Structure formats: C-alpha cells, structure tokens
A protein has these predicted regions:
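Class I S-adenosyl-L-methionine
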Residues: 1-14, 19-21, 26-125
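Class I SAM-dependent methyltransferase SAM-binding "motif I" and its flanking Rossmann-like core
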Residues: 105-165
C-alpha cells in the first residue's frame, strides 16, 4: 500500500526546496500537480529536470480559473467535482504506490492541496512536507526583516480585480 505525499516546493527556486522534498521528487514514480488548461503548471516548471525517467505524471488541470466569480454557485460546483475526481484518482493510485503531489509554496498556506487533503482523510495514507511560503521568499529577497520583537503580522487573502473591458 502506498501513500499520498504532498510536498511544498517553496517560492519557486529549487534551491529553496527542503532536502526531503528534493529527495521525494527525484525518487517518485508517480507525480501529480495542478495547472491551468494548456499550461505546464508552475509546480511542474519548478521541478523541471528533477523527475526520474519513466515517472508517471498526473496533470490536474483546473476546469476553470478566473472565468467565473470564485463565490458563484457554478464555480463552487465545478471545482468541487474537480477535487472529488482527483481525490478518487489519487486514492486509487495510492492503493499500490506512493504519489507525490507538487505544491507551490507551503501546502497548508492557501494551497490547492488542502481541498484534496480534506477529501482524502480516512481514504488514503497522507503525508505533507512543508515548504517555504512565497511571501517568506519575497521579504527575504528585500533583505529586510518583516517583523521585529512584539510586532503583529496579519495575512489577508485577496484576489486580483477582474478586467473591465
């Protein structure tokens, strides 16, 4: 029996990936990753050149991204079916082999894997490897500390405004 291993890739530079993530990716026989329709996918791009020959890839292609408002019933329904489908597929593969799911940043910080994680509870063995978040990479790139001493930091989620053509 295998398991589903979601590994955080960090902010986009393979040098900022954990040693454990690197090892899991290089030895994986099955790798899954999210992507927009017709694109390679950012997570897949980050690991380019790291995958073993003959690896089986599962491109989890989003059925919609920004075409519908994220809070509309149609968007919620389409994505729920998408995540249900991929939870089923990954659970099936994990019955006989490990599957490494690639996740940009950290899987539990606004990561798409969270939607699979909740659906896979009790159906498959799951392991999650943390990654450096994108925002952490950003503030380190500035060379300035983001907080000092008793500072409080708040993270707010936001979406880009839709184009008004």
């Amino acid at each position: 029996m295998g398991k589903i291993i979601c590994t955080g890739l960090g902010p986009g530079n393979p040098d900022l990936m954990s040693v454990r993530s690197d090892r899991l990716i290089r030895t994986a026989a099955h790798v899954a990753y999210f992507r927009k329709a017709g694109r390679q996918g950012q997570a897949r791009r980050i690991v380019d050149g790291m995958l073993a020959p003959g690896v089986t890839e599962y491109a989890m292609e989003y059925p919609v991204t920004t075409e519908l408002p994220f809070d509309s019933p149609a968007y919620i329904d389409v994505l729920a079916r998408f995540y249900d489908h991929w939870a089923d597929r990954l659970a099936q593969v994990s019955q006989t082999a490990d599957v490494v799911v690639l996740c940009e940043g950290d899987p539990f910080f606004y990561g798409s894997f969270m939607h699979l994680y909740t659906r896979l509870q009790g159906r498959a063995a799951i392991d999650v490897v943390p990654g450096i978040t994108g925002m952490t990479g950003c503030w380190h790139a500035t060379g300035l500390p983001i907080t000092w001493g008793d500072d409080v930091m708040t993270v707010l989620m936001g979406h880009a405004a839709r184009s008004r053509s």
